[in-house]
């Protein structure tokens, strides 16, 4: 299985320097520290997905760097949204939703006023625009929406679906992708005069690449899980040997045999383990192995389901 760099780590100086971002993004990193933990993590995830989408789309390194920073700043306007709305545990009322939508224009104004943020205003301003004209804040059409915003929109929608917000129910990866794919199809709510009756909200080409990015992420998770399962298998084999020696020790009647098997048991036990709590240790290892095997099966099935999706 190919090696995959899964996460764009904004706090790893080595990784930042490889993209020449260590100086340009340090200011933005400090600025977003003021956001609540969910929004900050969401911005990081959207930036990571955006970076990977740009790679899949074979965009230039310069544009990828620019687009990644735009994505990281896309929700910067939420600095000005009341926490009572931003962190509300229940679904927003229509009035609250209208206030929440203002984060796009608020983010735009913040970026325009700040010379260090100004180059990246497009992420904040346009990431909720839709190709069919049903987005906000301006209701722009396909050709008027910057390409970076089209990419960020898809990344933002995916992360918002798979990572549970306070007022939303978590859904699975495949179901999230189905929703995003559905949003590539024409909407009944699209303005009739737009001339884009065949366009959906999302760019099909970008959504196709999203499927590839998600599969890469799952394959990375599989590779990590396989390593852990292999370690568990080795440990269970060790524990099986201990169990065999314990059984033989318990069935032995001669003192020398009891001592002999006891010595082998002591050699196989790890620091912190003892023969007295062996049953619990053995059971916990078996349970962990079964759990990880089930996770692996689920991940493999997830990839199969994603590959069956059609755009």
What are these regions (language model features)?
Residues 2-310:
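Histidine- and acidic-residue-rich, metal-dependent catalytic cores
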């Amino acid at each position: 299985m190919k090696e995959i760099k899964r996460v764009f780590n904004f706090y790893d100086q080595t990784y930042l320097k490889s993209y020449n971002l260590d100086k340009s993004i340090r200011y933005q990193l400090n600025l977003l520290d003021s956001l609540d933990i969910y929004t900050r993590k969401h911005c990081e995830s959207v930036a990571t997905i955006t970076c990977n989408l740009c790679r899949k789309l074979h965009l230039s390194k310069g544009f990828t760097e620019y687009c990644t920073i735009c994505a990281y700043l896309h929700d910067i306007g939420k600095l000005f949204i009341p926490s009572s709305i931003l962190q509300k545990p229940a679904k927003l009322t229509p009035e609250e939703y209208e206030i929440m939508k203002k984060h796009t224009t608020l983010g735009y104004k913040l970026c325009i006023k700040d010379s260090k943020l100004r180059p990246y205003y497009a992420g904040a301003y346009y990431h909720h625009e839709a190709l069919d004209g049903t987005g906000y804040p301006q209701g722009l059409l396909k050709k008027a929406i910057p390409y970076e915003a089209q990419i960020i929109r898809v990344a933002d929608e995916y992360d918002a679906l798979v990572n549970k917000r306070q007022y939303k129910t978590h859904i699975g990866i495949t179901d999230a992708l189905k929703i995003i794919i559905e949003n590539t199809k024409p909407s009944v709510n699209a303005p009739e005069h737009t001339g884009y009756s065949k366009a959906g909200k999302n760019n099909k080409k970008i959504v196709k690449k999203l499927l590839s990015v998600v599969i890469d992420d799952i394959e990375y998770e599989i590779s990590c899980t396989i390593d852990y399962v292999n370690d568990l298998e080795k440990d269970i084999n060790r524990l099986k040997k201990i169990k065999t020696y314990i059984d033989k020790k318990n069935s032995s009647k001669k003192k020398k045999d009891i001592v002999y098997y006891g010595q082998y048991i002591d050699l196989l036990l790890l620091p912190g383990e003892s023969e007295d709590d062996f049953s619990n240790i053995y059971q916990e290892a078996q349970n962990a192995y079964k759990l990880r095997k089930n996770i692996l099966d689920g991940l493999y099935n997830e990839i199969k389901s994603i590959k069956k999706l059609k755009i």
